[in-house]
Amino acid sequence: MNDALADSGLVIVDKPQGMTSHDVVSKIRRTFSTKKVGHAGTLDPMATGVLVLGLERGTKFLAHMVASTKSYTATIRLGAATTTDDREGETITSASPDQLAGITETKISDAVKQFRGSIMQRPAAVSAIKIDGKRAHQRVREGEKVEIPARPVTISRYDILEIRRDAAFIDIDVEVDCSSGTYIRSLARDLGEELGVGGHLTALRRTQVGPFTLDNAVTLEKLEENPHVSLTLDQALAASYPVLSVSEKEASDLAMGKWLTPRGLKGIHAAVDPHGRAIALVKEQGKRLATIFVARPSTL
């Protein structure tokens, strides 16, 4: 039996430095000869690492991955603040060698602790956030002064790996686990402000998005040699959410958007039929077990 979703799924790319996330989407469109490609979670051109892309019906699933926890390794440079909060911006303040000499490892460690847990974070002005319909980075380039309100984020891990000193700066390698919407550039900026010497990001690598890690990621060169999805839509749903086994009849009902009798489930589950096919994402809403995303609608 032909599977209507045979070409649908996720491609996990190890994004190279220098490419925008949209550049990667364009490349994948050409590689797979399809226009139906999207990505979950923008990576700046400077950044490398895990970029999750959806193909065909997999693009519809991306909206349900946006809230995934993300992990990063990064290098924060203390001693200078920049217009973009990373190394690609212009320097706006610099600390003196004497100021940097007063920044002990204990002070750095204590400052980092202030940013663990649930915090309010002000996103970087040069970002993809829309303000009155226009991206913040566009407004900055046009000379506007942009101030984006702080928003709640959760930093579940913010660990110092190594501290390296120079007369003109202090580099700190860190590992961060955080909620979606967190800006690592903002963490660098805010750490520098907390210590009174300025700070910005000099390196960033995303190591995980939800359940998908660098072990799942493939380079663009490898994909060009052998185009293939990293996970089928069946595998993607089952990897991202707890599995709920359903009968043929229940699968048919879910495919038509019908609801099932609730079962006391908490959170979102991937409904999988007896053949191992992911039918839908479901969630209990009142007295219904309802679909929030149908992977295999009856119309396919």
Curated annotation (Swiss-Prot):
It catalyses: uridine(55) in tRNA = pseudouridine(55) in tRNA. Its EC number is 5.4.99.25. The keyword tRNA processing applies. The keyword Isomerase applies. InterPro entries: PsdUridine_synth_cat_dom_sf, PsdUridine_synth_N, PUA-like_sf, PUA_sf, tRNA_psdUridine_synth_fam2_C, tRNA_psdUridine_synth_TruB, TruB_C. One of its GO terms (molecular function) is RNA binding. The active site is at residue 44. Keywords: Isomerase, tRNA processing. SUPFAM superfamilies: Pseudouridine synthase (SSF55120), PUA domain-like (SSF88697). GO terms for biological process: mRNA pseudouridine synthesis; tRNA pseudouridine synthesis. Belongs to the pseudouridine synthase TruB family. Type 1 subfamily. HAMAP family: TruB_bact. Responsible for synthesis of pseudouridine from uracil-55 in the psi GC loop of transfer RNAs. This is tRNA pseudouridine synthase B. The gene is truB.
